[in-house]
Curated annotation (Swiss-Prot):
ATP-dependent specificity component of the Clp protease. It directs the protease to specific substrates. Can perform chaperone functions in the absence of ClpP. Component of the ClpX-ClpP complex. Forms a hexameric ring that, in the presence of ATP, binds to fourteen ClpP subunits assembled into a disk-like structure with a central cavity, resembling the structure of eukaryotic proteasomes. Residues 4-57 form the ClpX-type ZB domain. NCBIfam families: clpX, PRK05342.1. The lineage of its organism: Bacteria, Pseudomonadati, Pseudomonadota, Gammaproteobacteria, Alteromonadales. Keywords: ATP-binding, Chaperone, Metal-binding, Nucleotide-binding, Zinc. It comes from Colwellia psychrerythraea (strain 34H / ATCC BAA-681). CDD domains: RecA-like_ClpX (cd19497). This is ATP-dependent Clp protease ATP-binding subunit ClpX. Zn(2+) binds at C16, C19, C38, C41. ATP binds at P121, T122, G123, S124, G125, K126, T127, L128.
């Protein structure tokens, strides 16, 4: 075989026998017995061969699966509190990936799938726990909002779009997607609107639960490649959802009353009712910790759907002390993030202890949990972050309780040495 760089012996223009490009359109043209191939076609053939080989012998991950204790310790670095929920998640996730590594069938015993239901107030850390798990295990992760889902054929988002989003996260690598984690938020919002069957179809409530059943339990979903629309002549990607871990989360507002009603059935009403003192009041967290499947059915989830989420974890309502910890202790704590932002301007940022308490109290008053902390700090530091890049000789910004309450602006401390040098 020879490399052709110019015209043939008779000056005739030569073309690639595969793609038809002339020798002037490519870098190299290789000649064989009465055929020619260009460098671009050679590269394309190499890609095809590499892809075929990788499909025949996929690389198995040899990395050791972290133990439940190691998973819990990693969660502790990013999520404050919620000890019971972390333990439940660590065991469920470990068992799920152990099942994937060793096969669904062990010594003739078929191993079931353990999807997870997280119940907890807004801002208690449900989404953060799921995100942190995916990052720790280095698997694809996607989130879906249950309120946008509808049954197939109705206006809204089809449940199979969830799998499409997961594929997008890993460049449509099906094998990788099948080891991923899907978090479905606001799952309580698709509860059945009524205990009684209705003649009108509930396409965003019970209908979505029915549509999610097979997906969560395990089915082979047909997903159009690269996000295209479905049409009959199209080739679909086949994704086995039995290997995907589904975590569903919701605040379940009002579920505590369902639990309380079950626990105090028959205590009487009116003069016969049981009267409890203030010290006997049960907290929201303690009531939710006592949730049973029958309570979820009464709330509006269908029994079949609850059966597909066998692992239940309840998250505690965050108190002031926990919110202060969240502000300071995790690896990506909010105060650390803002300190880093100010450090880029060569300015030190200090949050005094009374400021942290004031931020936590404000978040509790708003009932936004940890989710509301950032908006409070952003609002307080807005003017400072706006003016700081144009200011000179600033060495430190101090935020105290009065700043959080809106009674004063952050304290600005100037570099005295630079000021003295400027005055001289």
């Amino acid at each position: 075989m020879t490399d052709i760089k110019s015209g043939g012996d008779n000056g005739k223009l030569l073309y690639c026998s595969f793609c038809g490009k002339s020798q002037h359109e490519v870098r190299k043209l290789i000649a064989g017995p009465s055929v020619f191939v260009c460098d671009e076609c050679v590269e394309l053939c190499n890609d095809i061969i590499r892809e075929e080989i990788s499909e025949i012998s996929p690389k198995e991950s040899k990395e050791a699966l972290p133990s439940p204790i190691e998973i819990r310790e990693s969660l502790d670095e990013y999520v404050i509190g919620q000890d019971h929920a972390k333990k439940v998640l660590a065991v469920a996730v470990y068992n799920h990936y152990k099942r994937l590594r060793n096969g669904d069938n062990h010594n003739g015993i078929e191993l079931g799938k353990s999807n997870i239901l997280l119940i907890g107030p807004t801002g208690s850390g449900k989404t953060l726990l799921a995100q942190t798990l995916a990052r720790l295990l280095d698997v694809p992760f996607t989130m879906a909002d249950a309120t946008t889902l509808t049954e197939a054929g109705y206006v809204g988002e089809d449940v199979e779009n969830i799998i499409q989003k997961l594929l997008q996260k890993c460049d449509y690598d099906v094998e990788k997607a099948q080891r991923g984690i899907v978090y479905i938020d606001e799952i309580d919002k698709i509860s059945r609107k009524s205990d009684n069957p209705s003649i009108t179809r509930d396409v965003s409530g019970e209908g979505v639960q029915q549509a999610l059943l097979k997906l969560i339990e395990g089915t082979v979903a047909s997903v159009p490649p690269q996000g295209g629309r479905k049409h009959p002549q199209q080739e679909f990607l086949q994704v086995d959802t039995s290997k995907i871990l589904f975590i569903c989360g919701g605040a379940f507002a009002g579920l505590d009353k369902v639990v309380e009603q079950r626990n105090h059935t028959g205590t009487g009403i009116g003069f016969g009712a049981e009267v409890r003192g203030k010290d006997q009041e049960i907290s929201l967290t303690d009531r939710l910790a006592d949730v049973e499947p029958q309570d979820l059915v009464k709330y509006g989830l269908i029994p079949e759907f609850i059966g597909r989420l066998p692992v239940l974890a309840t998250l505690r309502e965050l108190d002031e002390a926990a919110l202060i910890q969240i502000l300071q202790e995790p690896k990506n704590a909010l105060t650390k993030q803002f300190t880093a932002l100010f450090d880029m301007e060569n300015v030190e940022l200090e949050f005094r202890s009374d400021a942290l308490h004031a931020i936590a109290r404000k978040a509790m008053d708003r009932k936004t949990g940890a989710r509301g902390l950032r908006s409070i700090v952003e609002a307080v530091l807005l003017d400072t972050m706006y003016e700081l890049p144009s200011m000179e000789n600033v060495s430190k910004i101090v935020v105290d309780e009065n700043t959080i309450k809106g009674e004063s602006k952050p304290i600005v401390i100037y570099d005295s040495k630079q000021e003295q040098a400027a005055s001289e």
